[in-house]
Amino acid sequence: MARDITFLTVFLESCGAVNNDEAGKLLSAWTSTVRIEGPEPTDSNSLYIPLLPPGMLKIKLNFKMNDRLVTEEQELFTKLREIVGSSIRFWEEQLFYQVQDVSTIENHVILSLKCTILTDAQISTFISKPRELHTHAKGYPEIYYLSELSTTVNFFSKEGNYVEISHVIPHFNEYFSSLIVSQLEFEYPMVFSMISRLRLKWQQSSLAPISYALTSNSVLLPIMLNMIAQDKSSTTAYQILCRRRGPPIQNFQIFSIPAVTYNK
Protein backbone atom coordinates (compact mmCIF):
# COMPACT_ATOMS: atom_id res chain seq x y z
CA MET A 1 0.00 0.00 0.00
CA ALA A 2 1.31 3.45 -0.94
CA ARG A 3 0.15 6.71 0.59
CA ASP A 4 1.22 10.31 0.03
CA ILE A 5 1.84 12.90 2.72
CA THR A 6 1.98 16.53 1.56
CA PHE A 7 3.60 19.34 3.53
CA LEU A 8 2.27 22.88 3.67
CA THR A 9 3.32 25.15 0.81
CA VAL A 10 6.21 27.49 1.65
CA PHE A 11 6.71 30.91 0.02
CA LEU A 12 10.12 32.58 -0.38
CA GLU A 13 11.15 36.02 -1.61
CA SER A 14 14.36 37.70 -2.73
CA CYS A 15 14.93 41.16 -4.21
CA GLY A 16 17.12 42.25 -7.08
CA ALA A 17 20.86 42.48 -6.67
CA VAL A 18 21.03 46.30 -6.93
CA ASN A 19 19.55 48.36 -4.08
CA ASN A 20 16.82 45.81 -3.38
CA ASP A 21 15.53 46.27 -6.92
CA GLU A 22 11.78 45.56 -6.85
CA ALA A 23 11.75 44.83 -10.58
CA GLY A 24 14.21 41.99 -10.03
CA LYS A 25 12.25 40.50 -7.15
CA LEU A 26 11.89 36.74 -7.28
CA LEU A 27 9.12 34.88 -5.45
CA SER A 28 8.77 31.14 -5.20
CA ALA A 29 6.18 28.68 -3.89
CA TRP A 30 7.31 25.20 -2.82
CA THR A 31 5.18 22.15 -2.17
CA SER A 32 6.62 18.75 -1.25
CA THR A 33 5.08 15.30 -0.90
CA VAL A 34 6.59 12.09 0.44
CA ARG A 35 5.39 8.67 -0.68
CA ILE A 36 5.25 5.96 1.97
CA GLU A 37 4.97 2.25 1.15
CA GLY A 38 3.99 -0.38 3.68
CA PRO A 39 1.05 -1.86 5.58
CA GLU A 40 -2.01 0.03 6.75
CA PRO A 41 -1.05 2.68 9.33
CA THR A 42 -1.63 1.60 12.93
CA ASP A 43 -1.26 3.11 16.38
CA SER A 44 1.93 1.10 16.96
CA ASN A 45 5.47 2.43 16.61
CA SER A 46 6.44 3.30 13.04
CA LEU A 47 9.97 3.07 11.68
CA TYR A 48 10.53 4.82 8.35
CA ILE A 49 13.49 3.80 6.22
CA PRO A 50 14.44 4.55 2.60
CA LEU A 51 13.33 2.16 -0.10
CA LEU A 52 16.10 -0.43 -0.21
CA PRO A 53 17.92 -2.03 -3.18
CA PRO A 54 16.97 -3.07 -5.76
CA GLY A 55 14.57 -0.18 -5.20
CA MET A 56 15.82 3.38 -4.77
CA LEU A 57 14.71 6.57 -3.06
CA LYS A 58 13.65 9.12 -5.68
CA ILE A 59 14.12 12.86 -5.22
CA LYS A 60 11.82 14.34 -7.83
CA LEU A 61 11.42 17.99 -8.86
CA ASN A 62 9.39 19.85 -11.43
CA PHE A 63 9.35 23.57 -12.12
CA LYS A 64 6.95 26.31 -13.08
CA MET A 65 7.57 29.92 -14.04
CA ASN A 66 4.67 32.32 -13.42
CA ASP A 67 2.30 29.32 -13.21
CA ARG A 68 3.52 27.88 -16.53
CA LEU A 69 5.32 24.54 -16.64
CA VAL A 70 9.04 24.75 -17.44
CA THR A 71 9.62 22.00 -20.02
CA GLU A 72 12.69 20.00 -20.97
CA GLU A 73 13.13 21.97 -24.21
CA GLN A 74 13.72 25.26 -22.40
CA GLU A 75 17.17 26.48 -21.47
CA LEU A 76 15.88 27.42 -18.02
CA PHE A 77 15.01 23.76 -17.40
CA THR A 78 18.56 22.75 -18.33
CA LYS A 79 20.04 25.18 -15.80
CA LEU A 80 17.61 24.13 -13.09
CA ARG A 81 18.56 20.52 -13.78
CA GLU A 82 22.22 21.49 -13.29
CA ILE A 83 21.32 23.04 -9.93
CA VAL A 84 19.58 19.82 -8.85
CA GLY A 85 22.58 17.79 -10.04
CA SER A 86 24.91 19.92 -7.94
CA SER A 87 23.37 18.38 -4.80
CA ILE A 88 25.00 14.98 -5.42
CA ARG A 89 27.78 15.68 -2.95
CA PHE A 90 25.25 16.44 -0.20
CA TRP A 91 23.34 13.19 -0.68
CA GLU A 92 26.48 11.09 -0.89
CA GLU A 93 28.79 12.65 1.69
CA GLN A 94 26.31 13.84 4.32
CA LEU A 95 23.42 11.39 4.05
CA PHE A 96 25.34 8.32 2.84
CA TYR A 97 23.49 7.49 -0.35
CA GLN A 98 24.91 6.67 -3.75
CA VAL A 99 23.39 8.78 -6.51
CA GLN A 100 22.80 6.20 -9.22
CA ASP A 101 21.31 8.54 -11.78
CA VAL A 102 20.15 12.08 -12.50
CA SER A 103 17.43 11.70 -15.11
CA THR A 104 14.76 13.74 -16.85
CA ILE A 105 11.34 12.12 -17.23
CA GLU A 106 8.19 13.98 -18.31
CA ASN A 107 9.59 17.41 -17.37
CA HIS A 108 10.77 16.17 -13.96
CA VAL A 109 14.36 16.01 -12.74
CA ILE A 110 14.85 12.81 -10.74
CA LEU A 111 17.72 11.83 -8.46
CA SER A 112 17.84 8.07 -7.82
CA LEU A 113 19.45 7.35 -4.44
CA LYS A 114 20.74 3.96 -3.29
CA CYS A 115 21.01 3.50 0.48
CA THR A 116 24.53 2.45 1.50
CA ILE A 117 23.72 1.70 5.16
CA LEU A 118 20.72 -0.65 5.24
CA THR A 119 19.85 -3.74 3.20
CA ASP A 120 16.83 -6.05 3.12
CA ALA A 121 18.95 -8.72 4.82
CA GLN A 122 19.71 -6.37 7.71
CA ILE A 123 16.04 -5.43 8.10
CA SER A 124 15.25 -9.14 8.23
CA THR A 125 17.89 -9.61 10.95
CA PHE A 126 16.94 -6.52 12.96
CA ILE A 127 13.13 -6.63 12.63
CA SER A 128 11.49 -9.53 10.78
CA LYS A 129 13.20 -12.53 12.38
CA PRO A 130 13.01 -11.20 15.98
CA ARG A 131 9.29 -10.52 15.45
CA GLU A 132 8.76 -14.12 14.24
CA LEU A 133 10.77 -15.60 17.12
CA HIS A 134 9.49 -13.40 19.93
CA THR A 135 5.77 -13.02 19.36
CA HIS A 136 5.27 -12.06 22.99
CA ALA A 137 7.56 -9.02 22.76
CA LYS A 138 6.01 -5.55 22.86
CA GLY A 139 7.13 -2.23 21.44
CA TYR A 140 8.33 -3.54 18.08
CA PRO A 141 8.08 -0.93 15.30
CA GLU A 142 6.22 -1.42 12.04
CA ILE A 143 8.46 -0.88 9.00
CA TYR A 144 7.48 1.63 6.32
CA TYR A 145 9.51 2.50 3.24
CA LEU A 146 9.89 6.07 1.98
CA SER A 147 10.16 5.74 -1.79
CA GLU A 148 9.88 9.33 -3.05
CA LEU A 149 10.24 12.97 -2.11
CA SER A 150 8.51 15.02 -4.80
CA THR A 151 8.75 18.82 -4.92
CA THR A 152 7.02 21.32 -7.18
CA VAL A 153 8.39 24.85 -7.25
CA ASN A 154 6.66 27.79 -8.90
CA PHE A 155 8.84 30.85 -9.52
CA PHE A 156 7.22 34.28 -9.93
CA SER A 157 9.01 37.21 -11.57
CA LYS A 158 7.76 40.62 -12.70
CA GLU A 159 10.04 40.31 -15.71
CA GLY A 160 8.16 37.46 -17.29
CA ASN A 161 10.31 34.41 -17.98
CA TYR A 162 13.49 36.29 -17.15
CA VAL A 163 15.27 34.81 -14.16
CA GLU A 164 18.76 35.22 -12.80
CA ILE A 165 20.10 31.83 -11.76
CA SER A 166 22.18 33.36 -8.97
CA HIS A 167 18.88 34.40 -7.32
CA VAL A 168 17.37 30.94 -7.71
CA ILE A 169 20.06 29.02 -5.82
CA PRO A 170 19.39 30.66 -2.40
CA HIS A 171 15.72 29.69 -2.77
CA PHE A 172 16.72 26.05 -3.36
CA ASN A 173 19.06 26.02 -0.37
CA GLU A 174 16.71 27.83 1.99
CA TYR A 175 13.73 25.66 1.16
CA PHE A 176 15.41 22.26 1.28
CA SER A 177 17.47 23.04 4.38
CA SER A 178 14.37 24.25 6.24
CA LEU A 179 12.34 21.26 5.03
CA ILE A 180 14.98 18.84 6.30
CA VAL A 181 15.56 20.63 9.62
CA SER A 182 11.92 21.37 10.50
CA GLN A 183 10.11 18.34 9.08
CA LEU A 184 12.05 15.48 7.52
CA GLU A 185 14.61 14.93 10.29
CA PHE A 186 11.85 14.70 12.90
CA GLU A 187 9.45 12.52 10.92
CA TYR A 188 11.89 10.33 8.94
CA PRO A 189 15.27 10.40 10.70
CA MET A 190 16.53 7.13 9.21
CA VAL A 191 16.04 8.67 5.77
CA PHE A 192 17.01 12.33 6.16
CA SER A 193 18.95 12.82 9.42
CA MET A 194 22.71 12.75 8.94
CA ILE A 195 23.37 11.99 12.61
CA SER A 196 20.74 9.23 12.85
CA ARG A 197 22.09 7.56 9.74
CA LEU A 198 25.67 7.99 10.93
CA ARG A 199 24.84 6.49 14.34
CA LEU A 200 23.19 3.53 12.65
CA LYS A 201 26.22 3.09 10.40
CA TRP A 202 28.54 3.07 13.43
CA GLN A 203 26.39 1.02 15.79
CA GLN A 204 24.61 -1.59 13.66
CA SER A 205 27.41 -4.16 14.10
CA SER A 206 27.06 -3.82 17.90
CA LEU A 207 23.29 -4.30 18.15
CA ALA A 208 23.25 -8.10 18.00
CA PRO A 209 26.12 -8.58 20.52
CA ILE A 210 24.38 -6.21 22.96
CA SER A 211 21.02 -7.99 22.62
CA TYR A 212 22.57 -11.43 23.11
CA ALA A 213 24.72 -10.24 26.02
CA LEU A 214 21.65 -8.88 27.85
CA THR A 215 18.99 -11.46 26.95
CA SER A 216 20.79 -14.40 25.26
CA ASN A 217 18.62 -13.85 22.16
CA SER A 218 17.61 -11.29 19.53
CA VAL A 219 14.58 -9.89 21.34
CA LEU A 220 16.08 -6.40 21.80
CA LEU A 221 17.19 -5.82 18.19
CA PRO A 222 14.02 -4.08 16.91
CA ILE A 223 13.79 -1.98 20.08
CA MET A 224 17.39 -0.78 19.86
CA LEU A 225 17.02 0.06 16.17
CA ASN A 226 13.93 2.09 16.97
CA MET A 227 15.76 3.85 19.83
CA ILE A 228 18.35 5.14 17.35
CA ALA A 229 15.58 6.45 15.11
CA GLN A 230 13.62 8.09 17.95
CA ASP A 231 16.58 9.88 19.53
CA LYS A 232 15.75 13.57 19.01
CA SER A 233 19.31 14.60 19.87
CA SER A 234 20.09 13.50 16.31
CA THR A 235 18.18 16.44 14.85
CA THR A 236 19.95 19.53 13.57
CA ALA A 237 17.64 21.68 15.72
CA TYR A 238 18.92 19.97 18.87
CA GLN A 239 22.53 20.23 17.75
CA ILE A 240 22.16 23.97 17.07
CA LEU A 241 20.64 24.58 20.51
CA CYS A 242 23.27 22.59 22.38
CA ARG A 243 26.39 23.25 20.36
CA ARG A 244 28.05 26.46 21.58
CA ARG A 245 31.34 26.27 19.74
CA GLY A 246 32.73 24.90 16.55
CA PRO A 247 31.41 24.78 12.98
CA PRO A 248 27.95 23.42 12.13
CA ILE A 249 27.77 19.66 12.07
CA GLN A 250 25.90 19.63 8.77
CA ASN A 251 26.44 21.85 5.76
CA PHE A 252 23.17 22.93 4.18
CA GLN A 253 24.68 24.65 1.15
CA ILE A 254 23.13 21.81 -0.81
CA PHE A 255 22.92 23.41 -4.25
CA SER A 256 25.39 25.52 -6.23
CA ILE A 257 26.04 26.69 -9.77
CA PRO A 258 28.04 29.56 -11.38
CA ALA A 259 26.03 32.79 -11.43
CA VAL A 260 24.87 33.16 -15.03
CA THR A 261 21.82 34.99 -16.37
CA TYR A 262 19.42 33.18 -18.70
CA ASN A 263 16.39 34.53 -20.50
CA LYS A 264 14.15 31.96 -22.13
From Swiss-Prot:
Functional note: Required for formation of the SPO11-mediated double-strand breaks (DSBs) that initiate meiotic recombination. May mediate the interaction between SPO11 subunits during meiosis. Also needed for homolog chromosome pairing, synaptonemal complex formation, and for the proper timing of the first meiotic division. Not required for mitosis and mitotic DNA repair mechanisms.
Chain positions covered by the region annotation Leucine-zipper: 200-221
A Pfam family hit: REC102
Miscellaneous information on this protein: Despite weak sequence similarities, may correspond to the subunit B of a SPO11-containing topoisomerase 6 complex specifically required for meiotic recombination. Retains some of the structural features of the ancestral archaeal Top6B subunit (AC O05207).
Any one annotated GO CC term: nucleus
Assembly, per entry: Interacts with REC104; seems to form a functional unit with REC104. REC102-REC104 interacts with SKI8-SPO11 and this interaction is required for proper subcellular location of the proteins during the initiation of recombination. Interacts with MEI4, REC114 and SPO11.
Record-level GO BP terms: meiotic cell cycle
Family to which the UniProt record says this protein belongs: Belongs to the TOP6B-like family.
Compartments, record wording: Nucleus
Protein name, as recorded: Meiotic recombination protein REC102
Keyword Nucleus: yes
Keyword annotations from UniProtKB, A to Z: Meiosis, Nucleus
